Regions:
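Sec-dependent bacterial lipoprotein signal peptides
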Residues: 2-30
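Short acidic-aromatic linear motifs embedded in glycine-rich loops, typified by GG[WY][YF]DAGD(H)
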Residues: 33-151, 158-162, 166, 170-192, ...
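Long, repeat-rich segments with strong aromatic
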Residues: 308-346
Length: 447
């Protein structure tokens, strides 16, 4: 409420004194530096130097790194497909119900090195890694006991795991901290070994924070599993509770925060759950598995008028969460270690533990070694659907279990346009990486 009040008339002497005080104001102004007068103070903003010297700056870097990781991992409606979508298309998880050829290349498993979506996805992964590196370094320098430093290191490790799992052997890792240094090409084994040591650094920085310790442990074990170190991987996650979940979350405040998987799925009808894709694909859309809720009747997409419309119901809003790492994954890692140790009883026990959060009955032992491997990877596929695990798992089926690629990957005739699927088993490093003088080409495009 605004009120008005009349001003009383001042005595003559008081009027004179007020006039003298007012007359002195210009003198005071002249006595001040004009630079100081024009320098605005914004207490809610951080000067660039403060990013690396204050806890407030470290917190800002942390928030930025989480945002960059979310975009690199799960994409953004503002642009950037992320690892979830690109690997989902390349495997049997998702079918493309649209028409743009650059996206279709992923679903065909025939991605050109000049593909713009491939380049932005790859660049996003490395930008997020560098953001995590910088934030972790600042926390280590000014607040070494803050568990967020360990969290940043764990996310750095996760991004290296994703590079090792999803890209060809020979992808380099460069750094911009403190200055730009071009990295050499790394084999898949070298990249995953680096991920293990980075996760170890995260564990050392986690302190007593159970959430960060579990994130770092599952990330390390995932890399160990990729390296074929099954027993070591199981030991790494032994203390991780099944209830553990680490996730990132989209939002609605800005376009960058919004979910591209929702936009391309429920809105555009192009990012669609697959069903027995390319002969070898699993029955994701029709299995009625509680771990993989599906919307849609299977009617043709409104976009291409061909692809059956099934939507992943966990990603049914612009602000959904995406699981990055979990205790369920820890139990599945232990199960696979037991399978490789020829201990089917323990294997089934661990599979059952991984089903508990979904109130599912224990699985039956199929009996043969090959069928047990099939069940192991089916359990992983449904429990970790659309979380950027499947491409690495299909590669492991070929690399570690000796499966024929033609019997693992979606193959044969494409479901539209009269096209035939390609033979890519990973994503190529984009042509833009040739700016790096240490990189020439992928070393190996196999599993």
């Amino acid at each position: 409420m605004i009120t008005t009040q009349k001003t009383a008339r001042l005595p003559k002497r008081a009027q004179v004194m007020r006039w003298m005080a007012a007359a002195m104001l210009p003198i005071a102004v002249v006595a001040c530096s004009t630079e100081e007068l024009l320098k605005a103070n914004y207490p809610d903003q951080i000067e660039p130097a403060g990013l690396s010297t204050s806890l407030q700056g470290a917190s800002a870097l942390y928030a930025g790194a989480i945002g960059d990781f979310t975009v690199a991992f799960s994409g953004s409606a503002a642009g950037g497909f992320g690892q979830v979508m690109t690997t989902g298309y390349m495997t049997d998880e998702f079918a493309f119900g649209g028409t743009p050829p650059e996206i279709r290349q992923f679903d065909l498993r025939s991605v050109d090195a000049s593909n713009g979506i491939g380049a932005s996805t790859y660049n996003g992964l490395h930008s997020a890694r560098e953001a995590a590196v910088r934030a972790a370094g600042v926390f280590k320098a000014i607040a070494p006991t803050d568990p967020r430093g360990g969290e940043m290191k764990a996310l750095e490790a996760m991004l290296i795991v994703l590079m090792g799992e999803n890209y060809c052997s020979g992808a380099p890792i460069s750094t911009t901290t403190p200055t730009l240094t071009y990295g050499p090409s790394l084999t898949t084994v070298q990249a995953l070994t680096l991920a293990v040591s980075t996760a170890d650094a995260a564990l050392a920085l986690a302190g007593a924070n159970a959430q960060v310790k579990s994130l770092a442990a599952v990330t390390k074990a995932r890399a160990q599993l990729d390296l074929g170190q099954h027993a070591a991987a199981a030991a790494t996650v032994a203390a991780v509770p099944t209830s553990f979940v680490y996730y990132v979350k989209h939002g609605t405040a800005t376009e960058r925060q919004k979910s591209i998987t929702f936009t391309q799925g429920y809105n555009s009808h192009s990012f669609l759950v697959s069903n027995k894709e390319g002969i070898n694909g699993l029955d994701f859309a029709t299995a009625k598995d509680p771990r993989l809720p599906v919307d849609g009747s299977g009617a043709p997409s409104d976009f291409d008028v061909v692809t059956p419309m099934y939507f992943f119901a966990k990603y049914n809003s612009q602000d959904h969460a995406v699981v990055v790492s979990s205790g369920v994954e820890a139990r599945l890692i232990e199960a696979e270690a037991a399978l490789n140790a020829s201990n089917p009883a323990l294997w089934l026990s661990k599979l059952t533990e991984a089903r508990v959060p979904y109130s599912m009955a224990a699985p039956a032992d199929p009996g043969t070694a090959a069928e047990r491997v099939d069940l192991m990877f089916r359990e992983r596929a449904f429990a970790m659907f659309a979380t950027a695990h499947r491409l690495g798992d299909l590669r492991r089926l070929v690399r570690q279990y000796g499966r024929d690629p033609a019997k693992v990957w979606p193959t044969g005739a494409y479901h539209k346009n009269g096209l035939t699927r390609g033979t890519d088993q990973n994503m190529a490093v984009p042509a833009t990486e040739k700016n790096n003088p240490n990189f020439t080409a992928c070393i190996n495009r196999g599993a």
